[in-house]
Amino acid sequence: MRVLYGVVGEGMGHAIRSRVILDELVKRHDVQVVVSGRAHDYLAKRAGEHLAVKKIWGYQIVTEDNEVQNFKTLVANVKGALLEGGWPKNIKAYFEVLRSFKPEVVISDFESWSYLFAVNHRLPVISVDNMQIINRCKLDPALTLGHEGAFQVAKGIIKAKVPGAAHYLISTFFYPPVRKGRTTLHPPILRPEILAAKPETGNHLLVYQTYTTNPALPALLQQSGLECRIYGLKRDLKEPFVDGRLIYKPFSEAGFIDDLRTCRGVVASGGFTLMGEAVYLHRPMLAVPVEKQFEQILNARSLERAGYGLCAEELTEARLAEFIGRLPEFEKGLSGYAQDGNRDLLEKLEEAMQAAAGTGIYEGDDPSVA
């Protein structure tokens, strides 16, 4: 089967998940990937006989001081689309894919270009991501408390992103009731290096900061009493830089995974991918969601509710100390978590592809629910 696979390029979580799925798909199918941002370079390395990777333009999110800057995000995206050739580049890619590949089914990891291609050519779409949980599941009001407006905005955007798909596969470590049809929940997709990692409890914190605009973080970490191995805050490093208890490290996938599997706990944002990996390896996590990013708030609050760590919507010395003091409690909570690799989602994806092939896109969503 010829598969068009769209991957959103904001952040690396979607690309890491897609890499695992693509490695499985190319065993039986020919796949054309369309992807934007840094994710393109990551996935392009995997191109081969049955996998082609094409770069498109995609939106970006601007953050400062651990908060999404809505106006600057708007300006950056208008500039990218109109002044830097983003939309013309995407139109060119559209006709290239139409001429040379002729897909039979489309898979979208929260990516719009591939979805619009499917709509225009009456192709079935399968959604694979973690975001649709906000739209297609019933969330406990306690999880949205204080962020009801952000929840409704996020829900509306996500609902409009890939409407009317043949099936929605949602990757998650928490399981709210499903409220819409054609929707299934599955454990997180994990890269093989994580599945092969053997967790050992060391005496350091792993700190991962995607955005470099959180100037207060280093001073707080110095008060932790633990060695902190930090990735992301100093991106130009070629070798580790030591500042007291803080060890800033250049990014290395192997080094990062080793620090993750041996850490006492993780301090990071509310992004889903690392959170899922930490849960799988039974590593407690202090999740600091980016402000105004409801998906991260939901992830962090759900993590705390499950007993796997803490949510810190504002990171303070007291909250960090509480996290460290409760590490044994979180370790106990995590001890009961288990999943059978990636089998669950991958089997359902193949089943959904075979069922959807040749059926055309659905006319609309389940009319019984908003």
PLM features per residue range, with description:
Residues 241, 250-251, 284-330:
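Nucleotide-sugar donor-binding patch of glycosyltransferase catalytic domains
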Residues 95-111:
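Short N-terminal targeting/anchoring amphipathic segment
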Residues 105-109, 259-298:
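A donor-sugar binding/catalytic signature common to diverse glycosyltransferases
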Residues 322-370:
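C-terminal amphipathic helix plus adjacent low-complexity
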Residues 6-19:
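A short, glycine/small-residue-rich beta-strand->loop->alpha-helix junction that serves as a flexible
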Residues 9, 32-85:
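Conserved nucleotide-sugar phosphate-binding/catalytic loop shared by glycosyltransferases and other
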Residues 22, 189-265:
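Donor-nucleotide binding loops and adjacent catalytic segments primarily
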Residues 124-185:
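Active-site-proximal region of nucleotide-activated glycan assembly enzymes
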